[in-house]
Amino acid sequence: IEKVEKDVNSFVTLDKEGALKRAEEVQKLIDDGTLTGPLAGVPVAIKDNMCTKGMLTTCSSKILGNFQPMFTAEAVKNLEAAGAVILGKTNMDEFAMGSTTETSYFGPAKNPWNLEHVPGGSSGGSCAAVAAEEAPYALGSDTGGSIRQPSSFCGVTGIKPTYGTVSRYGLIAYGSSLDQIGPIAKDVTDCATILETITSYDKKDSTSVKREETDFISALVDDVKGMKIGIPRDYLGEGLDPEVKEAILAAAKTLEEKGAIVEEFDLSLVEYAIPAYYCLLYTSPSPRDAHES
């Protein structure tokens, strides 16, 4: 972190002393057999829109520059119970409203692969931290791509879980009917492991779902033979960079060569997807913000 953070700016808050103290405590629990899980003692970076008791939670905004919550987000509590060591809070677009992490009050995060490029957003700091190997994994939040897009930009793996899988309690909302917390890591296995840990029913979140199956690791397969993979033609047309299209089709060909069944198909009404998204998105925070103001 000390080597690359000045260039990447992944974090808005680093808790070096707290992390070292926590690591010592967790190590004792590992040694006496109290903690045995795969995340025990593993450092994690938390997106700065998730409440952490006693640690600044700013949403990368000057408005919340001194805000220290009195409670911790449920997903973060689940990680702590598993022995995770919190390194700090990661940079993001202010209040998650962006897709480049350039709107942060604390300065833009940079893409570790090319400092002239953006890491994506709004969870750009979390993805950059994992890509720069400042943290082995991180938590982000996704409303309309805020985990998936920066994960793609930074060459890491990110998952937006099905709505209701991970408690939103303690997540500072953007669009409550769309927000979801999810993992960011180097590969799918790590993400599945983290997702198993943060998944839980939480009565404090009215949209939380009691899932019958949370063994995501067992759902992973070693090959794609016989797997049907669809490619929507609508997304391969106007506005798509030719290099991106070429990369998508090359990946599809590789999957096909490995035994997958790849089929192109048409989606209807694609041109209305983004307008519909924004209608849903901004009707959610508008009444809340009007009430608070």
Predicted regions and their residues:
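A short helix-breaking turn/cap at a secondary-structure junction
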Residues: 160-247, 251
